[in-house]
Design a protein with these regions (language model features):
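Short, solvent-exposed loop/edge segments of extracellular or virion-exposed proteins
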Residues: 52-54, 152-159
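Generic hydrophobic, helix-prone segments enriched in Leu/Val/Ile
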Residues: 30, 50, 142, 149-151, ...
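C-terminal boundary/linker segments immediately following FHA domains
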Residues: 17-21, 47, 105-106, 111-153, ...
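Hydrophobic, helix-prone linear segments
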Residues: 1-65
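Short, surface-exposed loop and linker segments with low hydrophobicity and enrichment for Pro/Ser/Thr
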Residues: 34-45, 93-98, 138-147, 195-196, ...
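Intrinsically disordered, low-complexity, compositionally biased regions/tails
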Residues: 9-12, 21, 30, 34, ...
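Serine/threonine-rich intrinsically disordered cytosolic regulatory regions enriched
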Residues: 16, 159-161
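Forkhead-associated
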Residues: 61-124, 162-230
């Protein structure tokens, strides 16, 4: 299934993402935020889905240590794959100031067609094979420690996305091939970044942020929608 060019559904109709009524004790709950008088939005935690119009869908993971395994009902893995693999097949760790990525096999794992028996450092362009699933690891931006895992062949995540972004310091959306998410259009860039355990964004041109016009950036939440003349995206809970 190719999602390129498809416009994703609006992410404001599910009460688990954008709430029309407050949860219990919302005044004392730091995980919720009143964006307007009518909507209460839930703070981003460790994972989210990003739908970028006319580009695709992405599973974005924020933690430094992630589990990879088979997608099953009730599965607790961070990166669930629809493939013939173990329920907990491998661990992926981000370490050090340089943002080294280490994969630890919990079941048979191949890197560049060579089976690994111990934690192994990943390099830009490495192909990782886990059972019937194949992923390509890339560090697209030289000044960011965030990375990508691109699905090869019939490999799929659940829910379906085009790639996994391993977000460390920043996630850059733009028309440069070194960006983490690339759109093919005129020059424009939106950067997502973490600050004080909050997910924020900044844009090099004004955007509509959750219905607020002419914004240059702000905090993002589950259910947030960001729209500019060239880039539009929405965020959803990854469950």
């Amino acid at each position: 299934m190719n999602t390129t060019g498809l416009k994703r559904r609006q992410a404001v109709t599910n009460s688990t993402r954008v709430l029309d009524f407050p949860p219990p004790n919302v005044a004392n709950n730091g995980h919720y935020f009143f964006r307007t008088n009518e909507k209460i939005m839930k703070a981003i935690s460790s994972r989210f889905l990003m739908w970028v119009d006319a580009v695709g869908g992405y599973l974005v993971c924020l933690n430094n240590q992630l589990s990879i395994g088979q997608a099953r009902p009730g599965s607790k893995v961070d990166i669930p794959l629809l493939a013939d693999i173990s329920s907990k097949h491998a661990r992926l760790k981000r370490e050090g100031e340089e943002g080294d990525y280490i994969i630890e096999p919990l079941a048979p794992v191949l890197v560049q067609n060579q089976e690994i028996k111990s934690p192994t450092l990943l390099h830009h362009g490495d192909v990782i094979s886990l059972g019937t699933a194949e992923l390509q690891f890339t560090n697209p931006h030289p000044l960011s420690t965030s990375a990508r895992l691109d699905l090869i062949g019939q490999s799929r995540t659940s829910p379906y996305t085009d790639a996994i972004v391993l977000m460390s310091d920043t996630l850059i959306i733009g028309n440069n091939m070194a960006n983490h998410i690339v759109y093919h259009g005129d020059e424009h860039q939106i950067v997502l970044y973490l600050q004080n355990k909050k997910l924020l964004c900044r844009s090099d041109q004004q955007v509509n942020l959750d219905g607020m016009m002419e914004q240059s950036g702000g905090e993002l939440f589950y259910g947030s929608q960001v729209k500019s003349d060239r880039i539009s995206f929405s965020l959803e809970d990854a469950y």
